[in-house]
């Protein structure tokens, strides 16, 4: 297997870390992604959990420096159960929101319910996804979960959110348009 000692450990350059921390008060949101690059175990004896915790330690510094900062986790197809576990147990509790598609949601549902992947009822997909989203929201404590696939978007938000449903809908429409344009390119 291919092993890149930097890119597949989510190592942030010291220059980036210093710069982001210096200017973090100018940001309202910070998107966290890239966990699909991790490996479960590394030749040096470290694990994905070591690098997940290292990244979260830095994100905590950003939040301490600028408490209003919102952290958004954008999911991707993750290659190993150990990484999914690390995301569910360590990453999501630190996030304010997340975005994911049906494949990624199915992994979370599988993990939460101790089921095999792709056990969804093809005739009741929306019900399956919606119940899985609610279960994930309850377990994770996330304020917002954005579910997106080619057929529809669903956004679960906590009632304590200060953003109106109309503004949430407008944001979802905009993201749908952008995603559609990217598909055409």
Task: Tell what function each PLM region has.
Residues 1-185:
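Ribokinase/PfkB-type carbohydrate-kinase core domain
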């Amino acid at each position: 297997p291919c092993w890149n000692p930097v890119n597949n450990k989510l190592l942030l350059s010291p220059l980036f870390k210093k710069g982001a921390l210096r200017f973090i008060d100018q940001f309202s949101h910070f998107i966290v992604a890239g966990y699909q690059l991790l490996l479960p175990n590394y030749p040096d004896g470290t694990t994905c959990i070591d690098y997940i915790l290292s990244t979260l330690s830095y994100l905590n510094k950003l939040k301490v420096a600028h408490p209003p900062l919102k952290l958004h986790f954008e999911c991707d197809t993750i290659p190993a159960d150990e990484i999914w576990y690390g995301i569910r147990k360590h990453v999501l509790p630190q996030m304010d929101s997340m975005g994911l598609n049906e494949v990624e949601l199915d992994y979370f549902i599988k993990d939460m319910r101790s089921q095999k992947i792709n056990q969804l009822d093809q005739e009741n997909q929306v019900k399956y996804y919606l119940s899985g989203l609610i279960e994930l929201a309850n377990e994770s404590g996330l304020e917002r979960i954005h579910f997106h696939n080619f057929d529809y978007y669903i956004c679960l938000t906590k009632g304590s959110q200060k953003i109106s449903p109309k503004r949430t809908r407008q944001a979802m429409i905009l993201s749908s348009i952008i995603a559609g344009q990217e598909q055409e390119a």
